[in-house]
Design a protein with these regions (language model features):
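Cytosolic regulatory regions of ion transport systems
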Residues: 1-166
Length: 166
């Protein structure tokens, strides 16, 4: 069997960034499609055949696989990606197991979606550098836009935000 993923996704100096998005629900597919627009090589992985089919032909490569399975992730060269986004929201155990596997791989640029504060705390304890709370963060953003004259509001970190005022 020929391993095409190695030639497609192995990071190369001066080449476009390689990103694996593990979990292709609403959040993961949004991230993956935006990364494609940003000229990244994107490998999308999900266990749901419907999610994979929906993105077929829209990402550099999209595969049906279990992101908690070490051998499957190695065959897809996920351990060689520049960035990995764990976008699994529906199954807390799968999210944690996938993050744990990525940490064992030594993934340096690891992003993970948290469903709630407890999930986020577990992800931070596992060493995730970038924990994303999409619902909470968007709720805060909308609240600031509704209650002020800001045209846009992006919280960079607690106590620090970028705003565009009218």
């Amino acid at each position: 069997m020929v391993d095409l993923t190695r030639s497609l996704f192995a990071p190369r100096r001066g080449d476009r960034p390689t990103v694996a998005v593990l979990g292709l629900g609403r959040f993961g597919s949004g991230v993956a499609l935006e990364l494609m627009e940003s000229d990244c090589h994107v490998l999308g992985v999900d266990a749901d055949p419907g999610a994979v089919q929906a993105l077929n032909g829209r990402l550099t490569h999209v595969v049906r696989a279990d992101s908690t399975a070490e051998e499957a992730m190695r065959q897809l060269s996920v351990h060689e990606m520049d960035h990995v986004v764990v976008a699994i929201g529906g199954d807390l155990a799968d999210s944690i197991l996938t993050v744990s596997l990525m940490r064992r791989f030594g993934t340096h640029q690891l992003w993970a979606k948290a469903n709630d504060d407890r999930h986020g705390e577990i992800l931070r304890q596992l060493g995730v550098e970038h924990v994303v709370h999409p619902e909470r963060d968007m709720g805060r953003r909308v609240a600031h836009l509704v209650s002020t004259s800001f045209q846009d509001f992006v919280e960079v970190e607690p106590g620090l935000a970028m705003v565009r005022a009218t």
